[in-house]
């Protein structure tokens, strides 16, 4: 099935396919809905909006065909090009997204927590995201402000605050987590 590239998002207009993608891994968000539980999905008749990194992940796995507004196929390489042009540190952000997805986690936007991603073990509406992930640019060291922010955020939302970057030497995802603890 397909999704249409619109700006930096991919819109899945076929409702049945949108529901299937969401049920499979909580990909994207339904237009006009915030958080949808798996048991509510069949009641939704709205398009599914995928972030560019979500669409790329699905396209690379053959689960989604991305097309332009005129119907021409947009290959994963073109999605990567677009991401690099429009999104700072796109390669690293995508690598971090892919890292967590490949480990079996559900990865959603972490914007409401001031983070890049919220990472769930099973999915929104099933469990709470135990981790919020903040991107740390590879050339930037960790500051006292980063550590303070991590401590405050992990305490206020009771989640593991995780700084994530990609090593310039190895190309591997590197994580540093701060957990909330009651002393």
UniProtKB/Swiss-Prot annotation:
Catalysis: reaction(s): pretRNA = a 3'-half-tRNA molecule with a 5'-OH end + a 5'-half-tRNA molecule with a 2',3'-cyclic phosphate end + an intron with a 2',3'-cyclic phosphate and a 5'-hydroxyl terminus
PANTHER family recorded: TRNA-SPLICING ENDONUCLEASE SUBUNIT SEN2
Enzyme Commission number(s) from the entry: 4.6.1.16
Enzyme class name: lyase
Signal peptide boundaries: none
GO MF term list: lyase activity; nucleic acid binding; tRNA-intron endonuclease activity
Any GO BP annotation: tRNA splicing, via endonucleolytic cleavage and ligation
Active site: 120, 128, 159
InterPro entries: tRNA_endonuc-like_dom_sf, tRNA_intron_Endo_cat-like_sf, tRNA_intron_Endonuc_cat-like, tRNA_intron_Endonuc_N, tRNA_intron_Endonuc_N_sf, tRNA_splic, tRNA_splic_arch_short
Organism: Pyrobaculum islandicum (strain DSM 4184 / JCM 9189 / GEO3)
Protein known as: tRNA-splicing endonuclease
Keyword terms: Lyase, tRNA processing
Pfam families the UniProt entry points to: tRNA_int_endo (PF01974), tRNA_int_endo_N (PF02778)
């Amino acid at each position: 099935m397909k999704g249409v590239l619109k700006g930096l998002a991919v819109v899945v207009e076929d409702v049945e396919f949108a529901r299937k993608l969401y049920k499979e891994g909580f990909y994207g968000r339904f237009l006009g809905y915030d958080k949808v539980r798996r048991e509510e999905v069949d009641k939704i008749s709205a398009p599914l909006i995928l972030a560019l990194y979500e669409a790329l992940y699905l396209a690379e796995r053959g689960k989604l065909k991305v097309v332009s507004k005129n119907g021409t196929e947009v290959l994963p390489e073109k999605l990567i090009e677009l991401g690099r042009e429009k999104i700072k540190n796109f390669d690293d952000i995508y690598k971090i997204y892919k890292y967590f997805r490949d480990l079996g986690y559900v990865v959603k936007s972490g914007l409401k927590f001031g983070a890049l991603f919220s990472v769930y073990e099973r999915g929104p509406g099933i469990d709470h995201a135990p981790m919020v992930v903040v991107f740390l640019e590879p050339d930037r060291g960790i500051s006292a402000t980063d550590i303070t922010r991590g401590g405050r955020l992990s305490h206020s939302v009771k989640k593991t605050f995780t700084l994530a970057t990609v090593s310039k030497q190895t190309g591997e995802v590197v994580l540093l987590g701060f957990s909330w603890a009651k002393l």
